[in-house]
């Protein structure tokens, strides 16, 4: 698990942001609990995530796990029908298009896109456009 001082710092960040710790867990200003679900496709990851989940619960966060088959997982990813997923984003040795697909605002709400986090930020878009416009490897590396 996470060291106690790190958990204390995390709780301070949450309380500074307006969350209140109560017997029902972390509550927002409307007394709604902080809760989310982690969507998995591999049941072996459940065991790996347990220390993380236990730490979140220590903070008063109600977190659950849902493991589904590959078809349902893909369908839910494509529709952005999840709170959190555990995945890796494949990269190439020449950065460019995949970063645009993962992080560009134009991809944030398109079903089936790869911008799973729903990032929509003009600063990120400008950086990605600079990356795609790079003419040399040095420019590409600097932009990445």
Predicted features by range, described:
Residues 1-54, 120-127:
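Append "and occasionally in soluble cytosolic enzymes with long acidic Gly/Pro-rich linkers
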Residues 1-3, 12, 58-74, 78, ...:
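Extracytoplasmic/peripheral linker and loop segments enriched in polar/acidic and small residues
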Residues 26-27, 68, 89:
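Proline- and acidic/polar-enriched loop/turn elements at helix boundaries
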Residues 40, 82, 103-104:
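Alpha-helix boundary/capping detector
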Residues 42-46, 70-72, 90-94:
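Solvent-exposed loop/turn segments at secondary-structure junctions
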Residues 83-88:
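Paired acidic/hydrophobic, glycine-rich loop segments that form the ligand-binding mouth/hinge
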Residues 95-99:
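Short beta-strand-centered segments that line the small-molecule binding cleft or hinge
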């Amino acid at each position: 698990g996470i060291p106690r001082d790190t958990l204390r710092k995390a709780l301070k960040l949450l309380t500074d942001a307006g969350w209140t710790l109560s017997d029902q867990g972390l509550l927002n200003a409307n007394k709604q609990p902080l809760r989310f679900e982690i969507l998995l496709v591999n049941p072996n990851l459940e065991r790996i995530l347990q220390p993380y989940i236990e730490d979140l619960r220590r903070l008063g966060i109600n977190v659950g796990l849902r493991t589904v088959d590959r078809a349902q997982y893909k369908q839910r990813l494509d529709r952005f029908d999840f709170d959190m997923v555990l995945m890796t984003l494949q990269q190439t040795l020449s950065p460019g298009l995949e970063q645009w697909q993962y992080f560009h605002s134009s991809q944030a709400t398109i079903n089936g896109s790869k911008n799973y986090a729903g990032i929509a930020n003009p600063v990120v878009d400008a950086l990605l456009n600079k990356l795609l416009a790079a003419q040399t490897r040095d420019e590409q590396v600097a932009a990445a």
